[in-house]
Amino acid sequence: MQTALLKPKIIAVEPLGDHHAKVVMEPFERGYGHTLGNALRRVLLSSMVGYAPTEVTIAGVVHEYSTIDGVQEDVVNLLLNLKGVVFKLHNRDEVTVSLRKDGEGVVTAADIELPHDVEIINPNHVIAHLSAGGKLDMQIKVEQGRGYVPGNVRKFGDESGKVIGRIVLDASFSPVRRVSYAVESARVEQRTDLDKLVMNIETDGVISPEEAIRQSARILVDQLSVFAALEGTESAAEAASSRTPQIDPILLRPVDDLELTVRSANCLKAENIYYIGDLIQRTENELLKTPNLGRKSLNEIKEVLASRGLTLGMKLENWPPAGLEK
């Protein structure tokens, strides 16, 4: 009797427009279409990393209920329009950008002054309309985040929230705008009781629908891995014999396996950081004190570690293990 579960062998991606696609996966055992479709949908909507404006300072404006001479929109509508700008940051977690425009005309996202490692996905997005003599001068803080974070959460958790004129925004970081799924019938040879999973995904352009699916699947696999390693209750003798913490094999690999730039790799070796286990125990401040290792290299290291589920500043017991060569 066949007991092995089927795995999907056909994955098709059908573009439906800019940043919009239909992803079809089949065949699944009966019931798995809904099981996986619902899980992927929830992760896509709640757990994708993205970027959003979080704070704004506008010249001459004290609070969000103000108006600006020469600007058609009041500050509330101005901020709503600003939230529609889609930012993408490269090699950094936050940035402050400027928007300065005067004279009659339309203010769009393309008018925002950007550093070389920041881009705007929708430069034609309208932010405001200026009349003759109108002027707009703004400082916009953009941050990386996950999910939805209300402005009052950051405002009251941050003493700098008391600065007059600083407007803290509700931030929706998710790059996924809409997700839906449907389960249809599939057939393999004589079996007609199988599932076909059809997912309809629209993003804001920071990531593609295909990449969104990949990232959500990795998150699910990572979260479920703890259950795959689940063991029963140990006896007292077994518990005593297993008190020595087991070291994750990835920590024993050399930092060269991270495929960092030559500059970053050389800086780490100069500080006697030869293994990934050595690296994750260092803090950001410690690494920034390393000669020739700047913020750009630090961000590169953080991104590479994050892709493997690791961070800086982790604590390891019994490190280095006996016999580890330097």
UniProtKB/Swiss-Prot annotation:
Annotated catalysed reactions: RNA(n) + a ribonucleoside 5'-triphosphate = RNA(n+1) + diphosphate
EC number, UniProt record: 2.7.7.6
Entry's transmembrane regions: none
Region span, Alpha C-terminal domain (alpha-CTD): 247-326
InterPro entries: DNA-dir_RNA_pol_insert, DNA-dir_RNA_pol_RpoA/D/Rpb3, DNA-dir_RpoA, RBP11-like, RNAP_asu_C, RNApol_insert_sf
Keywords recorded for this protein, A-Z: DNA-directed RNA polymerase, Nucleotidyltransferase, Transcription, Transferase
Broad EC category: transferase
Start and end residues of each stretch annotated as Alpha N-terminal domain (alpha-NTD): 1-231
Pfam families reported in the protein's UniProt record: RNA_pol_A_bac, RNA_pol_A_CTD, RNA_pol_L
Record-level Gene Ontology MF annotations: DNA binding; DNA-directed RNA polymerase activity; protein dimerization activity
GO terms for cellular component: cytoplasm; DNA-directed RNA polymerase complex
One record GO biological process: DNA-templated transcription
SUBUNIT field: Homodimer. The RNAP catalytic core consists of 2 alpha, 1 beta, 1 beta' and 1 omega subunit. When a sigma factor is associated with the core the holoenzyme is formed, which can initiate transcription.
Function of the molecule: DNA-dependent RNA polymerase catalyzes the transcription of DNA into RNA using the four ribonucleoside triphosphates as substrates.
Record remark on domains: The N-terminal domain is essential for RNAP assembly and basal transcription, whereas the C-terminal domain is involved in interaction with transcriptional regulators and with upstream promoter elements.
Similarity section: Belongs to the RNA polymerase alpha chain family.
HAMAP family linked to this entry: RNApol_bact_RpoA (MF_00059)
Name assigned to this protein: DNA-directed RNA polymerase subunit alpha
UniProt organism field: Cupriavidus necator (strain ATCC 17699 / DSM 428 / KCTC 22496 / NCIMB 10442 / H16 / Stanier 337) (Ralstonia eutropha)
